Amino acid sequence: MGVFMTERADLVFHNKVIDGTAMKRLISRLIDHFGMGYTSHILDQSKILGFQQATATSISLGIDDLLTIPSKEWLVQDTEQQRFILEKHYHYANVHAVEKLRQSIEIWYATSEYLRQEMNPNFRMTDPSNPVHLMSFSGARGNASQVHQLVGMRGLMSDPQGQMIDLPIQSNLREGLSLTEYIISCYGARKGVVDTAVRTSDAGYLTRRLVEVVQHIIVRRTDCGTIRSISVSPRKGMTEKIFVQTLIGRVLADDIYMGLRCIAVRKQEIGIGLANRLITFRARPIYIRTPFTCRSTSWICQLCYGRSPTHGDLVELGEAVGIIASQSIGEPGTQLTLRTFHTGGVFTGGTAEHVRAPSSGKIKFNEDLVHRTRTRHGHPAFLCSIGLYVTLEGRDIIHNLNIPPKGLILVQNGQYVESEQLIAEIRAGAFTLNFKERVRKHIYSESEGEMHWSTNVYHAPEYPYGNIHLLLKTSHLWILAGASRRSSIVSFSLHKDQDQMNVHSFSVEERYIYIFDLSMTNHRVKHKLLDTSGKKDREILEYSISDRIISNGHWNLISPSILQDNLDFLAKRRRNRFIIPLQYDQEREKELIPCFDISIEIPINGILRGNSILAYFDDPVYRRSSSGITKYGTLEVDSIVKKEDLIEYRGTKEFNQIQIKVDRFFFIPEEVHILPGSSSIMVRNNSLIGVHTRLTLNTRSKIGGLVRVERKKKSIELKIFSGNIHFPGETDKISRHSGILIPPGTGKKNFNQSKKELKNWIYVQRITPTKKKYFVSVRPVVTYEIADGINLATLFPQDLLQEKDNVQLRVVNYILYGNGKSIRGIYHTSSQLVRTCLVLNWDQEQNDSIEEVHTSFIEVRANDLIRDFIRIDLIKSTISYTGKRNDTGSSGLIPDNGLNSTNINPFYSKSKIQSLTQDQETIGMGTLLNRNKECQSLIILSSSNCSQIGPFNGSKYKNVTKESENIIPIMDFLGSLGTIVPKIANFYSSYHLITHNQILLKRFLLLDNSKQTFQVLKYGLIDENSRIYSPDPCSNIILNPFRLNWCFLRHNYCEETSTIISLGQFFCENICLFKYGPNINIKKSGQIIIVHVDSLVIRSAKPYLVTLGATVHGHYGKILYEGDRLVTFIYERSRSGDITQGLPKVEQVLEVRSIDSISMNLEKRVNSWNECISRILGRPWGFMIGSELTIAQSRISLVNRIQKVYRSQGVQIHNRHIEIIVRQVTSRVLVSEDGMSNVFSPGELIGLLRAERAGRALDEAICYRAILLGITRASLNTQSFISEASFQETTRVLAKAALRGRIDWLKGLKENVVLGGIIPVGTGFQKLVHRSRQDKNIHLEIKKNNLFDLEMRDILLHHRELFCSCIQDNLYETSEQSFTNS
């Protein structure tokens, strides 16, 4: 009491209400001043006082005491309003799903936290004596979080995968939950209904598997006699408390000295006193015995196991420690979380620092040092590439704010900001990167339809044969509405007579090749769909004649339109041409040209210049399969050589104006063999041979004649000239000439001393074998007459040739090979000598020169039939090059000049020019493919999928005209995608205008009421970047950018601003159509498919925003069903510790399914150890030591990983339990070679100790390597087949055991239980092992082991200098790996 009086002056007098925190502080000070005994007396007095007062006041808890916070209602309303705006942004595709989720979570989290903070002040002001308030905030019972759920709102919950559900529970427990909120709350908490049920079943199955692995592990001996041990020392980050727990209950494997004094001896059990002494003295690494060091895998000894956790003494003999270990690990699994609770970026304070404006003013910064980006919520922002100063100019003061690199500026340059407005966000430093994880989020289609994207994509390299594409930039993905092909009747027709249906441009990556089989009877066409983009095994889908679709009562035959190869083939093999095969037509049987051999030849980029080849026809008459020489340069008449002008080779694809007439040309056949240089030739040079003469061992001649042999560097060229040999006299004129053609009817002088008339052309060639001697070869000649050009009327229908335009078409025949050019017909190839070409040209006006034209294929519906046209758009190149041109020719796949056919030698024969009537600017070229079919499509639109906007007739608005001398680029892209929805204005494009009488082409369409324009109907796909895509779902073709948005301006360079509606353009919902004029909004997102004079028809579409790096599942134009996977986003989110936590993490490690697989590291270590040690010690020692060291490292790594998971959840498990499990998982090795086929077979799993004993006993080494088995696999690889069969795969296990003749020694618990025997534990233990025999075995084994150990030590000491550094380095690396991985 005297002490109390002396220190009373130091104590502070408290006269206030104290809560739980203040009570803790008071108790702490009482203990410091008075000690434990006196403090407990004081606390007892306060407890009694509290009970007395509570009894007197009779405070009780009732449901009426739970008062909801008044501000909750308007807070939730405000949050709902924000969420509604967010939903609208998502609906308009301004943000994507991940950004929406993040933002939604943050909004609700902020609301919930605000309500939590409001709770205490609200109680204090309204009802300070509220029992709930008194109970929770005094610290008596309950915490703020629990009371918040009672009177505030439950807030956000997680789904079973650990993702936050963005639909919060707005109600509190006082108000009651709705059915949806109740189900979400069942998932939500750690003690939730669903969580508990699933966790119990998972933990139960884990326990069962663990029991299967270690049920036979029993303490059978006191000491196994091992000298092995494991060194333990406090690891980095390990607390002293955990290290003490690791030591207590273990047995020392070696003596411990402090200087010369021994403080602990071998085989001594470590208690709490010894453990504290070891830590205090900081003893060197302590060597202890663990289950890893025990000499047998089928049992364990007392000293290796250590203290029993039940009674605090050494474990008793006969105790089933394996069962205890498996239950110790499995049972706490019900306390572990099944998942990690992620907030999806809720706690922004930890990851980013906000910068707010100190006062109101104007923001200024250097725009050159920033670039546009998006925040993680989808808001527009500027990313600072380097450190940047932002100036805030207020009325009286100027503030300079420093934004570090990678900071985000959230306001625009020159924007006025209010005080405390958020202007920038500074990202956290590099140390937070370790706490992030990359997560995938899959987005599924909400409706059925056709997929289109509006940017370039590239094929994912890891899926070479799949349909997965990666996005190169932020853009929109559209799902165009439409029912699937399963619908049989089309209820709504969009296209009227002579409407344009489709546009095919020429930047095509065609995924299907259509094969026409014209050999079928009755001229039925069988169509095969051949997939070229898939794997090597191509799948052919056949559509029979009966496979039809009913459309408006007309039969629909699925027939393909254009034969187009894959893009690679187009560039290399097809020489940039598109082939349109024509169907067989009975009416054209008698015509000279079979129509199905005509091919269209158009460059990939679709641009043709003047005098370009548009189409060609290879006449089979001019096709030769044999070798020979073409001649048309010199002719001889009446033995007088007349040399006509030779036609020079012009290396250009354009036709020159001067044409030289060649009526005929000649082909001189010959047989050519190109043989390897080492071939042995059986004929002599300049000798005459007959037909079928053997030339080499494997080659015979097809014709007889003169043999010419010419040796080259690496080959031998052997030619055989058919014909006669003539030895001329002195008077022969012909001897002076070599290589001349003689026409028929010429006198043949001195040939065989007679004079005859020649019936056919012959070719005379002088051959000089020696300087003095020579002779003449007279060879037969094949003569080809070149026919006149084909009349255009045979190619194109008459009605279309009557159109007025200024385009000229002429048919030109030209020879593909030059004069004297040799043609090699080797390996059964044929050569085309003459090609008939359709040459395109147009009239050039003086003031209006057009240099090039754009070509495209279109489909036009006419009288319920589809007609295919080639559309040619004349382009004025003087204006159009001012804007940015993105021609696909520069993409690297196709050369810019399109038709770069180097093997075409333009020798022109007769040309027949047919001028078509002039006046207009276009040509409507008729069908090359005249198909009789109704409009068919696999996507069927109904009236519910389309909406009409208009009419616009009553609207009056003015056009804004601005005079300018310079050329003004028309395209105007506004900001980054997702910030401002771009105004749909200033889009110029080419339009096809169709009326019922003529086919015309205009360059643009102005939706202007003052200019009553024309009926425009075009069906194509043009995205917001004005790229045209083919909507033909049969072919699934993707069309890369084929730009039609040329910057057309008037001649006076006057820019006229009007609303330009592009056909095929995509609109987001709620966009105003007209900038100046009537307020007409689009009510639905979609694509314009029909433009009338006074209205539009829009096909409904659902837009999705996708960002850079997102993965798109499916090809362009793919038909998706509701619920199909559409996009996968990869994003980062905060994590705590591990990506996978709780029970799945434990299972992942025990089944060896880790992401950074331990087994991979294990394999590398084994190989490195085997290499080093086998080289020095030989194979048996090398394999043994390598496997031992590797397994030891892996065991420690596994134990640390599992303990880390349990400790993170607050569950304490002793290491020895985990060690028993891990020992069984790592106790097997895999026989890798057939070293001793009569002992072990390759691939057999054997115990490590058994392999070591066999290796020492046998002369030959057994090659094996360490392997990690998962617990399931380890359960099926035990010594008892009865135990294995009772776990899984009963039939397979028993059949295998019968075939191998396995014996089960019934040493475990389970097999004895199955057979009804006494289990060998507890009282039944002594029946299995006799004590006397056991002691005897122990003595012998200790002796043997020590001898072996001494031998090993001698070997290692002897070779220490040789390989010590190698082993230490490798051991250091592997141990570092194991500890860092753990």
Swiss-Prot record:
Q: Which reaction does it catalyse?
A: RNA(n) + a ribonucleoside 5'-triphosphate = RNA(n+1) + diphosphate
Q: GO molecular-function annotation terms?
A: DNA binding; DNA-directed RNA polymerase activity; zinc ion binding
Annotated cofactor note: Binds 1 Zn(2+) ion per subunit.
Gene Ontology CC annotations of this record: chloroplast; DNA-directed RNA polymerase complex; mitochondrion
* Cell compartments where the protein resides: Plastid, Chloroplast
Q: Which family does it belong to?
A: Belongs to the RNA polymerase beta' chain family. RpoC2 subfamily.
Listed NCBIfam families: rpoC2_cyan (TIGR02388)
Q: What is the role of this chain? A: DNA-dependent RNA polymerase catalyzes the transcription of DNA into RNA using the four ribonucleoside triphosphates as substrates.
Protein name, as recorded: DNA-directed RNA polymerase subunit beta''
Organism this protein belongs to: Dioscorea elephantipes
